[in-house]
Amino acid sequence: MATRLQFENNCEVGVFSKLTNAYCLVAIGGSENFYSAFESELADVIPIVKTSIGGTRIIGRLCAGNKNGLLVPHTTTDQELQHLRNSLPDQVVVQRIDERLSALGNCIACNDYVALAHTDLDKETEEIIADVLGVEVFRQTIAGNILVGSYCALSNKGGMVHPHTSVEDLEELSTLLQVPLVAGTVNRGSEVIAAGMTVNDWTSFCGSDTTATELSVIDSIFKLREAQPSSIVDEMRKSLIDTYV
């Protein structure tokens, strides 16, 4: 089930947080309500880490990550990098990237298996994405927008993309990503999907302006009604143990 919340009267919750199946990052300095909303849903299951990136709080737009890794921009300080490495699970690789397009969250949309990337990212960056996140990388646009990370929210169960995405594009993207997709909005009509929400395989957090209709679409496409965190995390633990054995 999706949870509605705000970050200091701001509905762009995907700007101030990053949620994956292995960890959750939240911006430092938000109201306690913001942090406790994440805590009540996630605390028993995955670590919730308060952090800044490059001295800013817009962490969701600056980093990209999944259960395998976390990519942060070159503006990230050594102290922040060390804090993230200390706080995240041991199997999560934290990598700082020397990439000109430093708002990595705007340029990369990914789940645990595939990533959509900005068409102008360096070849080297593309290789790092594939290597650190353990994903197949596709350079794409979404409804003509190059900022794929802004206009797409993705989990292993489904995805939501820019509302003006054509049926042909939806089908093509869905085939690439191997998950069902829907064109939709958050925060009462906002097209910038990833800024207004953050999602993993069992829960989602959306801006408080998100309407009941938008919420039901989110619950439906990401299959949140049937999701159980414990079973998903157990599966992940099994797969991790298998890789170590």
Swiss-Prot record:
<protein>
    <recommendedName>
        <fullName>Eukaryotic translation initiation factor 6-2</fullName>
    </recommendedName>
</protein>
<dbReference type="GO" id="GO:0005730">
    <property type="term" value="C:nucleolus"/>
</dbReference>
<keyword id="KW-0963">Cytoplasm</keyword>
<dbReference type="GO" id="GO:0005829">
    <property type="term" value="C:cytosol"/>
</dbReference>
<dbReference type="GO" id="GO:0005634">
    <property type="term" value="C:nucleus"/>
</dbReference>
<keyword id="KW-0648">Protein biosynthesis</keyword>
<comment type="function">
    <text>Binds to the 60S ribosomal subunit and prevents its association with the 40S ribosomal subunit to form the 80S initiation complex in the cytoplasm. May also be involved in ribosome biogenesis.</text>
</comment>
<dbReference type="GO" id="GO:0042273">
    <property type="term" value="P:ribosomal large subunit biogenesis"/>
</dbReference>
<dbReference type="GO" id="GO:0009793">
    <property type="term" value="P:embryo development ending in seed dormancy"/>
</dbReference>
<dbReference type="Pfam" id="PF01912">
    <property type="entry name" value="eIF-6"/>
</dbReference>
<dbReference type="GO" id="GO:0042256">
    <property type="term" value="P:cytosolic ribosome assembly"/>
</dbReference>
<keyword id="KW-0690">Ribosome biogenesis</keyword>
<dbReference type="GO" id="GO:0043023">
    <property type="term" value="F:ribosomal large subunit binding"/>
</dbReference>
<comment type="similarity">
    <text>Belongs to the eIF-6 family.</text>
</comment>
<dbReference type="InterPro" id="IPR002769">
    <property type="entry name" value="eIF6"/>
</dbReference>
<comment type="subunit">
    <text>Monomer. Associates with the 60S ribosomal subunit.</text>
</comment>
<dbReference type="GO" id="GO:0071215">
    <property type="term" value="P:cellular response to abscisic acid stimulus"/>
</dbReference>
<keyword id="KW-0539">Nucleus</keyword>
<dbReference type="GO" id="GO:0003743">
    <property type="term" value="F:translation initiation factor activity"/>
</dbReference>
<keyword id="KW-0396">Initiation factor</keyword>
